[in-house]
Amino acid sequence: MRPEDRIDGKKRPFTGAEYLDSLKDSREIYIYGERVEDVTTHPAFRNSARTMARLYDALHDPKKQAELTCETDTGSGGFTHKFFRVARSAEDLVGQRDAIAAWSRMSYGWMGRTPDYKASLMNTLGANAPFWGDYAENAKTWYRRVQESVCFMNHAIVNPPVDRHKAADQVKDVFITIDRETDAGIYVSGAKVVATSAALTHYNFLGQNMSAEITDDDLAVMFIAPMDAPGVKLFCRGSYEMQAATMGTPFDYPLSSRFDENDAIFVFDDVFIPVSYTHLTLPTNREV
């Protein structure tokens, strides 16, 4: 089941309750050497998850909708957060700015990885789909999907710092690499670091953080991975939120107890990425 399939009724953003329910899937999250069964109740993540849920609820608050939301441009007849629709005028840009600020104020500016932070990437998919060449239709589809539901999209673009003196293809065994390719999609393995807030997201965009010379086609790949895709594992750093709960109360730690955006390492172990989730590959029908 896709996260957005948990939304009850017509195409619209998640409510807070639906967002929390959407996190109760088969994702593999590890912290302190143990697997997290439910990020919405685990003491390392639950308060941060509830903070995110409050943002989604605000989209349905009649007192806040004028500032936060607008009609979709996908033909769904629904509404979305203003930053999830491509701006076509100066007025649209000002509206997006105000909507971003309104959500930011709800965490006193302490959460930078809320669902709207990757809306800029999703907007580029809709505004300049031809840039993605053979994957232009994928770009349009993801722009529509994320806009209509306000899915929580994250990114992980930094390679593990194994040996900075070597070219990427010399340390490819730990980088995200295409293992094999079929007509249905690609299989990838490897790791990415600094996957901030990934434990609380629906999807993650995997790509590169800078222009780099890549001589191995199997390293040239960009795709979107569902958090509950088989073979995807997330290894999280220690939780400030959990430390706050152990050492005191939210009154003692008002910020870290509520607004911890946990950083993590992504590990992909022979993960299947369908063609519809792929945005860039160089190899085609490679025999492995």
Where are these regions (language model features)?
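Conserved small/polar residues in nucleotide/adenosyl-binding loops
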Residues: 278-284
